[in-house]
Amino acid sequence: MKRKALAILFLFTALVASAQTYVRKTNLPTVYINTFGNVPITSKETYVYATMHYVDENDAVTAYDSLQIRGRGNSTWGFAKKPYRIKFQDKERLLGADRAKAKSWTLLANAADKSLIRNAVTSLMGEFTSLKFNPAAKFVDFVLNGNYLGNYQISDQMEVRKRRVDVVEQDLPLLDTSDISGGYLLEVDGFMDGNCFTTSTYSVPIRIVYPDDEDIVASQNQYIKKYIADFETVLNSRDYADPDKGYRAWVDSMSLADWYICTELTANIDGFWSTYFYKDQADSLLYWGPLWDYDIAYNNDTRKPGTKTQLMTDYGYGQTKEWINRMWSDPWFAKLINRRYTELLDAGLTDYLYNKIDSLTELLQRSQELNYQKWGINKRVYHEIVLYSSYDQYIADLKTFISEHSEWLKTAFAQKKPAEPTPPFSPGMFYYRIINAKTAKGLDIQGTGVVQYANTEGRLSQDWHIKPVGDYVQIINRDANLALNDPTIGNVGPTVNIGTQLNVVAPDEESPRQLWTLVPQGTAGYYNLLNSYTQHIANLQGGSANDYTSILSYTNDSRNGSSTNRLWYI
């Protein structure tokens, strides 16, 4: 009896729908959905049966006579302009051959994003990088039960499927021989919806998206939980930065770097609160992505203003940032992020984003006008920071943020990069100044004695030619044309017979007293001047700041890298 009643309802709805005229509202496609009996959609859990008509850019109408629709989202479900999830009876290639063939699709309202395009721009950013799976962004006008609801974005459902997250689908049902090493799709989910667990080391809330809640069995649950627990243990270990024993052996570095850079470039304050990552079968690595849920990114939330000059690892929500902050303390990761960010900028990432924004703005011009006739363009929906009177102002604000924040990130990333060791000195055909690290005064001469003197522009006695001689260098004064020399008399050695003032003498490449090694020290660009004959180090006497203080042949020991009297900037 229920089946007969349902069939009658389907027929009645189909007759009502057939009486409608399906035309485009603007230059975009228009989606018409009619629920059976005009039943309202009031739940994120319970589907309502419906029909759909899709009017494409050429005015061709495709009818779908049986699908289901329900609400979706967390905070966004509470907005007046609501997002939806639709599920077809059969798999449909809704967005063409280059996109997924699937039953489930999303209709994003982008209600809190006055530009309407933050999610789409972020997906395009992912395409520019190495990220494999980037959600669709097809903009349409949406009519539900005869009521125009505005501009919407058709996008993929986050699921394991070809042309979505394309990892191996596990056996269903599992067999004794089944490989349960993958695939898995996971989400860091601050809301803890569905099949979730919290990690023990960093307290990260993780939802197992795939295998589905109704399909996953205990062995799969145990496997992926242990895998993540082991990853965290390694990340938190003493050997975490070891390339073989540490976390690097557990992550795909390219997807990790690109996902993280996208999170920072968009300034997504929820980037570590809601994060997708996945593991494939017979693959030991974790992969990051897809990028999802960026409508409050790009400085669009009053709870976290000022993101233009903030790193999300310091400023954003979510426990995953503790993973990334731990990685930042590994010099390898810091170099990876700096190198990859430079590569993306050099490849034209920001210009690419500006061009995509311009194209989308032109595409949405008529649709956004209609959308804001209904919803109002200067009404606060959620936590928007700025309210403007025109759509173009929101677009300009978005582009300005990308321009200024992308530039700021260069410095922010560079500041987190570990200082590089001072490189070996490679002399050129120049005159050099040799400056003491403690006093910032220059190596100079007084008569034939070597002293320090205030660094003075045009003072030729402070200019030195550093001339390669085999494995050593001669250091020849420009004004006197005399070579730096260690005149120590008697027995010599690193700590023997120290304290003689250095002098300058006629250049002689055969004299070991005139041959020096410039020994790199630390990361600040300083060197020791090591004499090849005495094995002594050039040292500022007593650390005095006075002009004409003598430079001595002095102790060569473990303090070479820390005593500023012995350190020189060239």
Model-derived segments and their meaning:
Residues S43-E45, G96-R99, R118-N119, Y152-I154, ...:
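Short, solvent-exposed loop/turn and secondary-structure capping segments
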Residues Q20-N58:
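N-terminal module-boundary/linker segments of secreted carbohydrate-active enzymes
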Residues K87-R93, A102, L107-A111, L131-P135, ...:
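Internal "kinase-insert"/substrate-recognition segments embedded within catalytic cores
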Residues T422-I570:
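Lectin-like carbohydrate-binding module/patch detector with strong preference for beta-trefoil
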Residues T51-A109:
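Conserved oxyanion/phosphate-binding beta-strand-loop segments in alpha/beta enzyme cores
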Residues T129-D141, N268:
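Short, well-structured beta-strand/strand-turn elements
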Residues M1-Q20:
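Bacterial Sec-dependent N-terminal signal peptides
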Residues L28-P29, V39-I41, A63-L67, S75, ...:
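Middle-to-C-terminal accessory/interaction subdomains
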